[in-house]
């Protein structure tokens, strides 16, 4: 074959590669085979690259295996194909095999395999490749440096990524993009914006591209920096990026405004997108749902369904997930009914969200039915059910389903293990919890995280074994975090261990002085013990620092309308009726059950009458008060469902228990920790929460 003819065929192969024309590329391959002398090292490498990029890995391997001679380009093209097709471990395996055959990598080989390490979160392998780069002098090459920044960022080593970035001499736009994206991935939104400022000052040849600006908008949306986000929006307009044709950037703007609570601006940006993506639709629908605009959210979803039947599983599961979090059963069922008509509605991730929705709405039987009907179950499916059982106080069922999962040869991950340990904790199953914890590393090879230790601390503490719980924290091989100390402090209050509580409180105020929850917990510890001076000091210290605790919020759905209440709020139009209803309920509780329990659990040094008024203003009581006011105290056999963002307090718990006895109404309350099903004076938690 004459050189010009071979060169023309190579040019055709490059076009086929760029445009994904595997059939036409295959015809060129056949012609080269028939010509006898057409295939050589160069044309074979082009064929491997073409087949890989056209998603034909088997054909790429056929060419590779038939080559009498291979060079680094041959190996690198095949590795790139593995990464492109999602076989990341395959690429790393080829990298090792190439080394065994004595072929040295080039910058492209290093970049490809560092990318694989980042996507696999394979830090150890990434470190080995970095060491190899240093050994043969490739680290300073900009392509390799960029890939190192990306790898370290994805593996959670942002400081290492920054060190490599600083050593890159001739930084390209890709270098800056990798560092900005790394900071965003690590949650350092401000640093991402600062890096963009440095990039502007560096005056690089290339202007920011869509990737740069999308990362910056993510930095603002993930940290709630609306002012900075608006500045980026202004930069987009001035730079000519903000136009209806730029769907990626405009979609990121929608996401920014949604996450910062600016729905009007989000809708305005959304309406400007000509080719709306599924992500932009999902962002806006979720935004309306999260702000309580459920009618608007459902309307948008129906409009999306009319325009596009290919709604993906991520959008469906995300929207159902919002209704699950708000425990909106009616809307969740509507979404389920719409989802089953779509091809993606039967995917495992969507069905997982449906099961989760039923569990979070308190319908265990419905959740079990959906779970049983699922054809394919992944570890998330089992984790959802284990978590749900735990929240409902069904610890034995959680443990049983965990072992059933193992019998189906599905290995638990660290989240699944956290769910079953938490279930044991909520149900007081100390022996089972300790046994499961011992198998975490030993049997399943999962390195315990601080959250796993926190479950065991909670397990021991609920049984009154506070010294053992403290000893576990002191001796565990990882650094304790704020959450585990807060768990122990809460247990000290429950068991009245003031001395240990003081010790734990000092640790918390030292390591997390800006967290209002710590001052509230210390105040409650002292208040319950009647140490009013110490309680006042804790509250005053929190006030001096300008800290405010998260307000209690509850909601209840009545006649297709969701009513939200905040503790101490009196803005609801039926507030006078609600207060009278609650007073009447309290009167009946006193007369029929001798109810005075709440007075000793109201943690303020005020007179009894004021305590009673404070307790009556708790958000869950206001929600129940509305349900009783609209339906009357005589709704025998009915069920009232209330949902709260924080843990239910002791007084409200006792109040609802008594109420379920005198009214013969069942009450289901989901708080931040678990479900409480009240019936005939008893709670499903067994007063253990």
UniProtKB/Swiss-Prot annotation:
Keywords: Repeat. The keyword Transmembrane helix does not apply. It holds the Pfam family DYW_deaminase. PPR repeats lie at residues 5-39, 40-70, 71-105, 106-140, 141-171, 172-206, 209-243, 246-276, 277-311, 312-342, 347-377, 378-412, 413-448, 449-479. Residues 560-590 are annotated as: Type E(+) motif. InterPro entries: DYW_dom, E_motif, Pentatricopeptide_rpt, PPR_At4g14850-like_plant, TPR-like_helical_dom_sf. The keyword Transcription does not apply. Belongs to the PPR family. PCMP-H subfamily. NCBIfam families: PPR. This is Putative pentatricopeptide repeat-containing protein At3g15130. It comes from Arabidopsis thaliana (Mouse-ear cress).
